């Protein structure tokens, strides 16, 4: 749950890990497992969390306002990984009811619905400790040559047997990463890989700044792709 100090830091713009407090996070409250939802909606008269766990009914789980902070929160027991959700917001300006995506969502549906998915990011264990420890010494761009391979993951290679679908993160780790290393590059620069609604775009219309696009797999598969890059001594740059 958000503390008064969290809200103070958020209000002054210094809650640097706000993504750990806002969004959807699995918690336990009074012995009940569930998910804590929090969203900043300063001009809302009312906010509810809606999802497939309550029939998308805004009357079921209204959120409580945390005063002048503009933050709303709710704890919903029984919600778990895989449940989809949005926020329904009633404006205090004109009374309009709007369904909004979670700006702190970490995983989204692959269609353009904008629904986020509750997901535990701790299910993956990073394997790049050695790379991270040596990065300042071995990967400094100021004192050594840098050669970057810029790529759009969705169009690098297609799979005819799957109707022309792009490679998954795991497949890219097996095919793209060794290719880039073999070609002598030091870095991979990914054209926008954060969640966006239109698959035919380059990805600059971002709706989820904390979520790698689900078009190529879940968040842990993206982490595995990054791990593969680091295992091949390749730095990663996000466009």
Give the positions of each predicted feature.
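Hydrophobic faces of well-ordered beta-strands that scaffold small-molecule active sites
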Residues: 147-151, 188-190, 236-238
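Short proline/glycine-enriched turn/loop motifs at strand-loop junctions of beta-rich domains
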Residues: 40-47, 56
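Aromatic-lined carbohydrate-binding/catalytic grooves of carbohydrate-active enzymes
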Residues: 159, 164-167, 178-224, 234
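Short, surface-exposed loop motifs enriched in S/T, G, D/E and P with embedded aromatic residues
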Residues: 59-67
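The feature marks proteins involved in alpha-glucan
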Residues: 1-32, 36, 66-150, 155-164, ...
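Short beta-strand elements bearing conserved aromatic residues within extracellular beta-rich modules
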Residues: 47-49, 85
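Short amphipathic alpha-helices and their capping/turn segments at secondary-structure boundaries
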Residues: 135-138, 173-184, 226
């Amino acid at each position: 749950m958000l503390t008064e100090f969290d809200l103070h830091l958020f209000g002054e713009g210094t809650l640097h890990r706000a993504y750990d407090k806002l969004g959807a996070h699995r918690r336990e409250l009074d012995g009940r497992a569930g998910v804590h939802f929090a969203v900043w909606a300063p001009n809302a008269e009312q906010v509810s969390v809606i999802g497939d766990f309550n029939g998308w009914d805004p009357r079921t789980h209204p959120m409580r306002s945390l005063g002048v902070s503009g933050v709303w929160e709710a704890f919903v027991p029984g919600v778990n990984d895989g449940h989809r959700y949005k926020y329904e917001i009633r404006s205090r300006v004109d009374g309009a009811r709007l369904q909004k995506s979670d700006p702190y969502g970490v995983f989204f549906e692959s269609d353009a619905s904008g629904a986020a998915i509750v997901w535990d990011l701790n299910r993956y264990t990073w394997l790049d400790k050695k790379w991270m420890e040596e990065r300042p010494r071995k990967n400094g761009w100021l004192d050594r040559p840098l050669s970057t391979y810029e790529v759009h993951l969705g169009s690098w290679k297609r799979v005819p047997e799957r109707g022309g679908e792009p490679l998954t993160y795991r497949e890219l780790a097996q095919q793209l990463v060794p290719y880039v290393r073999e070609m002598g590059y030091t870095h991979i620069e990914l054209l926008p890989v954060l969640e966006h609604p239109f698959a035919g775009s380059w990805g600059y219309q971002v709706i989820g700044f904390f979520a790698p696009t689900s078009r190529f797999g879940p968040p842990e598969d993206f982490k595995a792709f990054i791990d593969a890059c680091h295992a091949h001594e390749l730095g990663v740059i996000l466009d």
